[in-house]
């Protein structure tokens, strides 16, 4: 990493810990800053704060006392999850204390070029796909950002010959000023996180910050399936490379079941390692990045054909007696499950669905359920899910949890069938998060395979 003097002997407050705050505190300390960490979790329940204290970093835990800002801090580094209407943040802005984001801090010291990926859906899969393809092509791609590897930690080991492939949320982008990736991808834009941003317009504005400092020598990859992309493309200085599953564009596109880049056929959609229309979009964005990065077509095709997905995101788990299992526990809403179902033959598919009851009906899902071999329904939303199954004329069984649902599905399945966990609901009625729910599916698969 580059050693910079910008923060030498500067008083800096880290507001909110978690992985990114801990990484930022360590990086700034290494750069000579006088760091104070403030986290709302009590100290005795806060191993990260305890570890930082042992390293000589000042920590204040249990609350966010506004009077802390009277200590003449010169910068604040804010955890992405803390909104700008937080009293501490509002007070810092009123005192004209510059607020930095952890990803911008990483950018300041990065020797490696950055490929930034954002969007409403598909960020993690596309980020992982891109890194896999670049590494397969002999480059050194390092995953970072919102994918679980704090950018300010990864950047400390990155060298000029590496590439940081960085997943970026709207929370991380809303406060950037200098951040400039060489290549940026916006997978799609949907109305999400409106409780944080206030409106779809403000949400889009946050996402659009990814390209704010880009120039014509940089590349911005946009989803041409969405009308909003054409409007946004007119306002960037970056060179725009579109991708589309609906039309031929001057970039990456799907035509007659083949994925192309500028008239060069790369791979058949049926050869992709992960199913679903959304994964064709993810693959097209990946192809665009790979071609801009000089990766050969055969390597791109080989890598995409072997890509098994990201854990809990339409992850191909494996087969037992020619019955294939997919873990899509991350699908916590109707749209995500619709996209998952688009990649399968319903007549050979057993769907496990249901979870937290948020009060919504599943009428929009009914057309996607038509022709399903069977549904296994679970969770608080079971009655609503059963109504959708009845409208689609799909038979169903009920289960008490994911393990029981998976066992039932396996008993019903025949050679050539697929079992898909894609709940269309959040997990919190039965599980702490979608990861724990998905892990139960994976563990049950392992048990069934052991007994087979």
From Swiss-Prot:
Indicate the principal place this protein occupies in or around the cell. cytoplasm
> What GO terms fall under cellular component here?
cytoplasm
**Which superkingdom does the taxonomy of this entry point to?**
Bacteria
As for what it does, the entry says: Cell wall formation. Catalyzes the addition of glutamate to the nucleotide precursor UDP-N-acetylmuramoyl-L-alanine (UMA).
SUPFAM superfamilies referenced in this protein's UniProt entry, alphabetically: MurCD N-terminal domain, MurD-like peptide ligases, catalytic domain, MurD-like peptide ligases, peptide-binding domain
Gene3D superfamilies recorded: Mur ligase, C-terminal domain, Mur-like, catalytic domain, NAD(P)-binding Rossmann-like Domain
| Keyword Cell cycle among UniProt keywords | yes
The name on file for this protein is UDP-N-acetylmuramoylalanine--D-glutamate ligase
Could you tell me the EC number(s) of this protein? 6.3.2.9
Matching entries from InterPro entries are given as: Mur-like_cat_sf (IPR036565), Mur_ligase_C (IPR004101), Mur_ligase_C_dom_sf (IPR036615), Mur_ligase_cen (IPR013221), MurD (IPR005762)
The UniProt entry's sequence similarity note says: Belongs to the MurCDEF family.
Q: Where does ATP bind?
A: 119-125
Q: Which GO terms describe its biological process?
A: cell division; cell wall organization; peptidoglycan biosynthetic process; regulation of cell shape
């Amino acid at each position: 990493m580059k050693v910079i003097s910008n923060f030498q002997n500067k008083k800096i407050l880290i507001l909110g810990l978690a992985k990114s705050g801990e990484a930022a505190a360590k990086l700034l300390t290494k750069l000579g800053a006088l760091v104070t960490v403030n986290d709302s979790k009590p100290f005795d329940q806060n191993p990260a704060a305890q570890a930082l204290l042992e390293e000589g970093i000042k920590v204040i835990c249990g609350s966010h006392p506004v009077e802390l800002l009277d200590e003449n801090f010169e910068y604040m580094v804010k955890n992405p999850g803390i909104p700008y209407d937080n009293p501490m943040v509002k007070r810092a802005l009123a005192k004209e204390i510059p607020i930095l984001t952890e990803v911008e801090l990483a950018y300041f010291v990065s020797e490696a070029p950055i490929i930034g990926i954002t969007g409403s859906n598909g960020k993690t899969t596309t980020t992982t796909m891109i890194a896999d393809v670049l590494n397969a092509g002999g480059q050194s791609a390092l995953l970072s950002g919102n994918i679980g590897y704090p950018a300010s930690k990864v950047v400390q080991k990155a060298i000029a010959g590496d590439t940081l492939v960085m997943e970026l949320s709207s929370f991380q982008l809303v406060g950037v000023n200098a951040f400039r990736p060489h290549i940026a991808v916006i997978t799609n834009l949907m109305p999400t996180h409106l409780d944080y941003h206030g409106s779809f317009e403000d949400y889009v504005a946050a996402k659009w910050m990814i390209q704010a400092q880009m120039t014509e020598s940089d590349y911005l990859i946009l989803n041409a399936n969405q009308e909003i992309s054409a409007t946004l493309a007119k306002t960037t200085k970056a060179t725009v490379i579109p991708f589309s599953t609906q039309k031929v564009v001057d970039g990456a596109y799907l035509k007659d079941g083949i994925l192309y880049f500028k008239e060069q056929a790369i791979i058949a959609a049926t050869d992709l390692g992960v199913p679903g229309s959304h994964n064709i979009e993810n693959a097209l964005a990946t192809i665009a990045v790979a071609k801009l990065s000089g990766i050969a077509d055969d390597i791109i095709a080989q890598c995409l054909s072997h890509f098994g997905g990201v854990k809990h995101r339409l992850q191909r788990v494996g087969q037992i007696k020619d019955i294939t299992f997919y873990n899509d526990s991350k699908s916590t809403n109707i749209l995500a499950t619709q996209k998952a179902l688009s990649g399968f033959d319903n007549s050979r598919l057993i769907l496990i669905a249901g979870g937290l009851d948020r009060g919504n009906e599943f009428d929009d899902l009914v057309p996607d359920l038509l022709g399903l071999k069977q549904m296994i329904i679970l969770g608080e939303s079971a009655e609503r899910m059963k109504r959708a199954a009845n409208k689609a004329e799909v038979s169903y069984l009920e289960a008490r949890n994911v393990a029981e649902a998976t066992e039932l599905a396996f008993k019903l399945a025949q050679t050539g069938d697929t079992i898909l966990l894609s709940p269309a609901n959040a997990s919190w009625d039965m599980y702490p998060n979608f990861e724990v729910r998905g892990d139960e599916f994976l563990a049950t698969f392992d048990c069934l395979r052991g007994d087979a």
